[in-house]
Amino acid sequence: MSDRFVIWAPSMHNEPAAKCGYCHGNKGGNMDQLFALDSWAHRYMNKMDVVKIENCTIGSFVEHMDVATYDRMCNMGFRRSGKFLYKVDPLRNCCRLYTIRTAPQELNMTKELKKCISRFATRITSEDYCPAAVASSDFVGKIVNAEMNSKTFYTRFEPALYSEEKYHLFVKYQEKVHQDYNNSPKSFKRFLCDTPFGPEAVLGTQESWEQLNNWQRMKPGEKLKHMGPVHECYYYEGKLIAITVSDILPSGISSVYFIWDPDYSKWSLGKLSALRDLAIIQRTNLQYYYLGYYIEDCPKMNYKANYGAEVLDVCHSKYIPLKPIQDMISRGKLFVIGEEETKVTKELYLVDSETGRGEGFPTDNVVKYKNIAEEIYGVGGCAFKSANESALELKELYGIPYEEEDLDTIYHLKEHNGHAPNGIPNVVPGLLPLWELLDIMQSGKITDLEGRLFLFEIETEGIRPLINFYSEPPNVKKRICDVIRLFGFETCMKAVILYSEQM
């Protein structure tokens, strides 16, 4: 069962945009930026008093998954908060959140970043320290040389577990930097310690921690032994001054959170931590640095572009360099890459191969690409008609309780009396389209889940394999389809779905 993906049935969580931690429902007078596409803004800009702009998240609590599975999930647009695995609905959400990643060789060492490293080296080394000769562009060498010659600064990788020392720094940071006074040991553990990974990934081995804590000495080609969540604690003159919370994945390091002591604000610890993570990635022979989400119209999130980056096109499950598409996503808009001559008639086929996700988009001639998001997901887009047709067939032929959804349910008009979606909507960019789900039914591929997928009903406390999809109750069929749409068919084959008849 070590590779099983044990999850609660997925659900959609909507709350007013005012509760969004990024825009707070206010785009500084540019209210059209609350909409994913211009056609939706034009449709509703004069009806803002009846439109419900929301913060829309789709996800699932995960009881267990392996690190390799989470690596794939990151390359599908997911992030985790403790045990909650989620992604946003980029069509309905008030902000467009794009998975962003970079690599050491992509970093543009600006004057500001060079100063950050230089000041750091000066602070942690003695006056008689003579830096080893390294190329001016070798930021990794400069960081490594300074740290290995410091008698006052060091870091320590350790399991992502609670300690009073870490918690006290967390509270100080939250209160002084974010004016957040609603903290507790329980919330700290839930956010920064709880994980869906097994004990072998959380606790590691003495050998794996020793190797990680000597990352500066790793040889080219040497394989990193530890994969899983970590806390890297920064110490200066014996005092804990910062904590990097990360997940080390087969393809790279995923940044979860960074905590720093406000008394050391002049150190630019946020910039330093990103530079150090990139240095660690290079020396440990990993590939990518996942910086979380990028939001083009949010200063708290768009600084990530400074590290050289590519963002995920969730409809292709592929990455594309950020610079060539910045005009496409300006003013908080949704993008889906397509070739100039491409004419789309339905949502794009979503790659369902575990090996096909997370690759770079072919960008030999980026100029030939255009944004086809309007053609698919705009007011006159092809996605909705196609999805409604598939929804009716899925219901009539296979007893899966999908319903038609009309356009005015997209932004939940306050006075609208038509059918509103129940649960995960029919059309969500980055989820398996309903026409593709219908193909799975019509081809008989759905039977590949039988004997492989397991179901656990909370009321009966009984676990059972799926024996015959077609004979399952409608609500169970729908839950299975939600998992397929959200996480992919191949992942569903190794899933255990926990569900309650009361939910």
Curated annotation (Swiss-Prot):
It is found in: Cytoplasm. GO terms for biological process: proteasomal protein catabolic process. Its main location: cytoplasm. Its EC number is 2.3.2.8. Transmembrane segments: none annotated. Keywords: Acyltransferase, Cytoplasm, Transferase, Ubl conjugation pathway. It catalyses: an N-terminal L-alpha-aminoacyl-[protein] + L-arginyl-tRNA(Arg) = an N-terminal L-arginyl-L-aminoacyl-[protein] + tRNA(Arg) + H(+). One of its GO terms (molecular function) is arginyl-tRNA--protein transferase activity. The keyword Coiled coil does not apply. Involved in the post-translational conjugation of arginine to the N-terminal aspartate or glutamate of a protein. This arginylation is required for degradation of the protein via the ubiquitin pathway. Does not arginylate cysteine residues. Belongs to the R-transferase family. Present with 2030 molecules/cell in log phase SD medium. This is Arginyl-tRNA--protein transferase 1. It comes from Saccharomyces cerevisiae (strain ATCC 204508 / S288c) (Baker's yeast). The lineage of its organism: Eukaryota, Fungi, Dikarya, Ascomycota, Saccharomycotina.
